[in-house]
Amino acid sequence: MSAQDLSPSRRSIPEPRAMLELIKPVTWFPPMWAYLCGAVSSNVPIWENKGVVVLGIVLAGPIVCGMSQAANDWCDRHVDAINEPHRPIPSGRIPGLWGLYIAIAMSLLSLVVGWQLGSWGFVATLLGVAAAWAYSVEPIRLKRSGWWGPGLVGLAYEGLPWITGAAVLLATADTSPGFPIVMMATLYALGAHGIMTINDFKAIEGDRKLGIKSLPAVYGPEVAAKIACTVMGLAQALVITMLYLFSKPYHATAVLVLLCGQFWAMSVWMRDPEGKAPWYNGTGVVMYVSGMMITAFAIRGFTV
């Protein structure tokens, strides 16, 4: 490793605040929420299994998601030096190889905690950790692709935690997730491709310089925003259709109302795709994840 790979800093140990910033608490919500959606959709009493639920939520958010952020920031330190030089690693607040050490330590911690959730929890954790490194690290680095990268993150952030939350609770009843749970989790995970694309709007300049083919970098902000909106909209349209087919008209209508709200937010976002991407994250995405919980309640205990 060359000297250029190390953060220029006179510090020998990381700043405590910088370590918290490195694992980005703001990113923990989606997998925590998805795990809770899975627990709800299982129709297994949550209060009676609150220990498993809380442990799974902590694993999905602060531990696995936090680990993925640390790994991504370490592997992205050259990009961040261009786009966001104030971040912990390029700024030197986390010096030397400390970013890598933190990511590795949290990977091991993830597996230890995942083991406490049984075979379902451990295998899911193993997949989540593998996905995090596959997304960021060379030579795999799936984030170089604007299609594979967001798709992998969507599955890891939404689909995998949802199915895991349901599977861990259902294991207490000696059963496993059925088709409705797997299908709805998968649809929302596929739709999350659009949500993950939104996050790429803040790094267009650096992505282009370093050859990362995110959708905004390759197609431009306007086309990328249209792709993201289409993906999110189609996934939810399929969810709504299936809920009607499952004879859950009230839940389907509620998700439809939220989708209409997203269409309004999308129209606002499209006026300035690059500038309003953070705004859409705080409006349209909130409606998207609200629909996830409505869907979870709709399919709890439902079999086909």
UniProtKB/Swiss-Prot annotation:
It is a multi-pass membrane protein. The chain crosses the membrane at residues 26-46, 51-71, 94-114, 117-137, 151-171, 178-198, 227-247, 250-270, 279-299. GO terms for biological process: light-independent bacteriochlorophyll biosynthetic process; photosynthesis. The keyword Transmembrane helix applies. GO terms for cellular component: plasma membrane. It holds the Pfam family UbiA. Pathway: Porphyrin-containing compound metabolism; bacteriochlorophyll biosynthesis (light-independent). Catalyzes the esterification of bacteriochlorophyllide a by geranylgeraniol-PPi. This is Bacteriochlorophyll synthase 33 kDa chain.
